[in-house]
Amino acid sequence: MKITQFVFGLLAIFSPAVSAQQNHIVIENTNVRYCISAQGRNISFIDRASGVDYLKHDTTSACALVRCSDVEYPATSVFLVNGRLTIEFSEVNVKAVLHVESLNSYIRLTVESVSGDNIESLMFLNIPLTLKARPDESFGSCALSLNLITRVNQLPALQTSLQALCYDKFGIEGAKVAIVATPTEKILTTLKQVLTEADEMPHCIVAGPWANDVPFNHGSYLFNFGSLTESNVDEWISTARKLGVTQIDNHGGRNFFRFGDFVLNHKKWPQGWDTYRSIVKRLHDAGIGSIFHTYAFFIDKQSKYVTPVPDKRLDAFRTFTLAETIDSNDAEITVNESTSGMSTVTGFFEHNSVILHIGDELITFGAVSQEPPWQFTNVKRGAFGTKPASHKKGAKARHLKECFGLLVPNPNSSLLEEIARNHADIVNSCNFDGIYLDAIDGSSILRGPDECWYWADKFVFEIQKHLKKPVGMEMSAMWHHFWQFRTRWQAWDYPQRGHKRFIDIHAASVNSGLLLPLHLGWWNFQQFNPPQVEPTFPDVIEYLGAKLIGWDAGISLTGAIDPDRLATVPLFRRAVDTLCTCEELRRSNVFDERVKAKLREPGKEFSLFEDKSGKWRFRPAHYDSHTASLSEPWSLSWKTWNPFRKQPVKFRIETLMSAGSYYDANNITLADLSDLNQLTESQRSADGITVSLGETSNGPNGSVIFSAASSGKVPRNAAWARLDRRFSPCLNLKEHKAIGLWIDGDGQGQIIAIRLESPRHISYGAVADRYITVDFTGPRLFTLIETESARWSDYVWNDGKGLYNLYRETIDFDMVESLSIWYNNLPKDKQAKCIIGPVKAMPMVTCTVKNPVVTVNGKSIVLPVEMQSGSYLQFNEGNDCILYDSKGQILCRVIPNGDIPMLSAGENQVRFSCDAGDGSVPRLKLTVISHAEPF
């Protein structure tokens, strides 16, 4: 490698007319000049072409820091001689020597030596920048780690701060980083050069800085969970072509292949991976790529590493010592060490197991003592096909690690590398085109969250080292070293409600500084399944398709698209057709950047249509939804907004589920706030919020005055207070999924939220929220059924919840652990004061909407039809009015009575009515639709 030496050295200016501030160290190449004072403080980081200094000057920053005995110390002096930068930390008598190489397109720093006592870590690069790490900036910079022991926290390719660390536990000497600073348009080219010249890491020339050059990385894919066999390859090829996807993701587990040892289900693939090699070849011949999808280093409990003889390289939380000998039939195990705090709670995301490893036997336990004698009881011997045996006093019992229902290799053993090689062997043998390392977001189970970067990176390095050809990767997490092996960014799991808002949040979270091809995720389709799942109506899919085109992002479909489902659920078939069209339009690059910019605007909706010339076009659309119930007369009249020109109204009516009577004796009372003993915790609230409960004689028995006031310390949408009740044992609300609530409102505009939760290990932290906006005064009785999602994102809750908890996961109504009653959006310096009656769980029941009437600005249209819960009516224009069942099957065409009402530009008054029946109270959602001219 040819190294060009540029100016770098100690500039000692001896003229007394020159300020001592000029006595500093300069490290530079053709693009950037980095200046450090002799005292180790950053002075500047200058783009040599423009003269702009990108160093962040709001605070003084040290060029390096050392951590000793858990205290961090800044550099106190630096000097540069013959390409060696010596950094001293006089407060702790530590010295580090860096080899500095100024190359044509980047600068390389290597830690050559370090001396001192109690050194835990060394940050040998620290340059805070004013850059925003956006691709629209003219200048970009990146610190790129050049080996496994060098930690860089920020992701490539564009960064806001350049830092590099190394640790005593992994090795300090030899840590190495590249400083890249260049015009943004050249950053990927430069990073290609850096990685090509990096000799301590595997190379993958189809990922990272090369990713955008590879068509495969821009594709979309279809999931295969084990149904693709030799006998149906042609069907899969046909389906893929119909869907417009060019890849198949082969997701292991279940009845496909085991994680860890990757043994295929021999009933389906009798020749093992030899069979699958021929499947992949047939897909390749048809122009379809294949991805090998695993749960990273996690290990199936039926794998060879577990049964019949458990591998001693399986990792454990801790090790116990048998206090007495046990024979092969004993159902209790006594140990010397404390078992206090241990639990039998396990679940998908839980870091816990009920498995003990003693000798060559695995044992599960059903209970564990919290006080002496320390015992595991209700044990089952010879678990997972191991052999029960006697074990002597003093034998070691290891409590095995588990997450995602899978076991874990000890990362300090050879098993981590062995499983990595297993990946490479399968990919090499079958000629897979990509690897998806799912579950690697669980890497904290190895050695804690602060070491994820090292062990996860090590695992990826080991796979890449053994591949025979460059194979790119996707992963369920992201650390710095992953970027150079990553082909695309940012697949998320699909939402089950709040679809459009979720898409916008997903797109907004895209880290454009990664400069990788985009992927907007794993999608599935839903049909009517209340109260926690919302159907994916055509406008949802058009919204998704528009964003895919706008962002030039791929997509993947996880299920619901096999031929049988598409045949029996026309709603899904229409969704697939729309996505297929959008995918073809995206790949063909039909729309220019001006149109794409419109399509990717958050919240902006579009309808896709084919014009008379056969050309696909988008037109701006607006969907304004409102839920109404005949039992809530205030809900039957409302205002809707049309942002476009005056036009005939279009709408969709969805018949929802209803509920029984609030006063039914068979309801389950979830909270009677007049009984303060029901509250399991004291009231909680945001900063500056005061809360009180008061007695009242108004309202149903058990009513209280719930008061709260905000002093304004937090924004209004973050002004919350909550009351909580826990149920032990959990409540079974399987037949009581609706909520009834009586409220005497104060008209202050706050929201009241009713939240149900199941145990975390069962429902992954999901919540079932229902909201009421208190924009009214006086008493009202509410029936709450459908759970919230999008509106949760309008407020700050400080509840530790994330998007998946609200948009994706569902609670288990069979096991409801808690109820919370919230205020949020409390006004400043005003007391919110509502009377709240008992919160009741009520049965959901079906209802009928008969002969609905939609009135817009005083003009009505009557729809002579009966609609059952789950059905929906789509009225477009003229006589285009169709009633569908919950699967999207056409039930009948409806001929409306009356002239079509006109939507005015701006605000419009809407009213709904229908014939009353003998059954449950009709409930519905009416969505008013308007359009602008196409573009």
Which role fits each region the language model picked out?
Residues L122-L125, P648-F651, Y662-I668, L673, ...:
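Extracellular beta-strand ligand-recognition surfaces/modules
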Residues L693-A721:
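Short carbohydrate-recognition loop motifs
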